Structures are given as C-alpha cells and as structure tokens.
Amino acid sequence: MSKVVVRKNESLDDALRRFKRSVTKAGTLQEARKREHYEKPSVKRKRKSEAARKRKKI
C-alpha cells in the first residue's frame, strides 16, 4: 500500500500528485485491474505467449 505524508506547507494537490506517482510506480492500480476478474491459466499462458511474440516482432 502506498503511503504519502503531507509535508508542512505542501498543498493537497501536490501530495495527491506524489501519491498517484507512487501508486503508478508500485503498479498497485494495474495489479488491481488485472485481478478484478478471474483469468483461467490457459488464457493467462496464451496472453503471455502473444505478448512475447509481439515483443519479439518489434
């Protein structure tokens, strides 16, 4: 869980911006979206294989 302490004389917008950056860097939101619905192992393997094929192509 990302945690941001609001500094003295820091606006709430700046603290929110730092929080969003830390969440993005940690990959928390992406992980939550990935786990939102169950994905069968066969589908997971297929997606992983297609991603590798796409990376290799480029």
Swiss-Prot record:
GO molecular function: structural constituent of ribosome
The keyword Lipoprotein is annotated on this UniProt entry: no
One cellular component (GO) term of this entry: ribosome
Superkingdom of the organism of origin: Bacteria
Basic residues composition bias: residue spans: 43-58
Protein's GO biological process: translation
Classification via InterPro entries: Ribosomal_bS21 (IPR001911), Ribosomal_bS21_CS (IPR018278), Ribosomal_bS21_sf (IPR038380)
Biased composition (Basic and acidic residues): 31-42
UniProt key word Endoplasmic reticulum: no
Family: Belongs to the bacterial ribosomal protein bS21 family.
Protein name, per record: Small ribosomal subunit protein bS21
Lineage: Bacteria, Bacillati, Bacillota, Bacilli, Lactobacillales
